[in-house]
């Protein structure tokens, strides 16, 4: 089950988002979900829990060939892998046709980036992502509960 953290509605300069991020990351470490977290990852918008992969960058850009399509690209990094290892960094991209209904981009990303397409638990920091009008936390919950009978 995902643990939600309250987010403050303070101005960017007041440090509310940073306090929330630090509190959330401290919970991750204390819970044993992650044994090592690089200081560089403190500003990453989300961290995967119970896997050895973290998404280190994500960007959205228009697909030049078709203007009604967006591309979401990023890099997932394997914790503990040598930087020279071929599987240390996994680049990924997926597209979404803005005119057609279908799987959410977040669900596509979660299933495309990580091998074996197993359900994932994920922590989202104060930078809330929204895809197709749905908060990312709800999309993550949908992916996590995929195929389980104990999910609402």
Swiss-Prot record:
User: Any signal peptide, and if so, which residues?
Assistant: 1-42
Where does it live in the cell? Secreted; Host cell membrane
InterPro entries found in the cross-reference section: Enterotoxin, Pertussis_toxin_subS4
What's the stated role of this polypeptide?
A: PTX oligomer B binds to receptors on the eukaryotic cell surface and facilitates the translocation of the toxic subunit across the cell membrane.
What cystine linkages occur within this chain? 73-93, 145-151
Q: Which GO terms describe its molecular function?
A: toxin activity
A Pfam family annotated for this UniProt entry: Pertus-S4-tox
Q: Does the keyword Secreted apply?
A: yes
Q: Which domain of life is it from?
A: Bacteria
Q: Name the GO cellular-component terms.
A: extracellular region; host cell plasma membrane; membrane
Q: SUPFAM superfamilies recorded for this chain?
A: Bacterial enterotoxins
Asked if the record carries the keyword Signal, the reply is yes
Q: Which UniProt keywords apply?
A: Disulfide bond, Host cell membrane, Host membrane, Membrane, Secreted, Signal, Toxin, Virulence, Whooping cough
Oligomeric and partner information: Pertussis toxin contains five different chains, S1-S5. They are organized into 2 functional subunits: A, composed of S1 (which is toxic) and B, containing S2, S3, S5, and two copies of S4 (B binds to the membrane receptors). Dimers of S2-S4 and S3-S4 are held together by S5.
User: Can you name this protein?
Assistant: Pertussis toxin subunit 4
């Amino acid at each position: 089950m995902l643990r939600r953290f309250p987010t403050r509605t303070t101005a960017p300069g007041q440090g509310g988002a940073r306090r929330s991020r630090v509190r959330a990351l401290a919970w991750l470490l204390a819970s044993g979900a992650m044994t090592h977290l690089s200081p560089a990852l403190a500003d990453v918008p989300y961290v995967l829990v119970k896997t050895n992969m973290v998404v280190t960058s994500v960007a959205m850009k228009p697909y030049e060939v078709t203007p009604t399509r967006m591309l979401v690209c990023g890099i997932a990094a394997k914790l503990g892998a040598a930087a020279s290892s071929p599987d240390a960094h996994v680049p990924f991209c997926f597209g979404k046709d803005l005119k057609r209904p279908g799987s959410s981009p977040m669900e596509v990303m979660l299933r495309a980036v990580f091998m074996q397409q197993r359900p994932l638990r994920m922590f989202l920091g104060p930078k809330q992502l929204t895809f197709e009008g749905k908060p990312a936390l709800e999309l993550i919950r949908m992916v996590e509960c995929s195929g389980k009978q104990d999910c609402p």
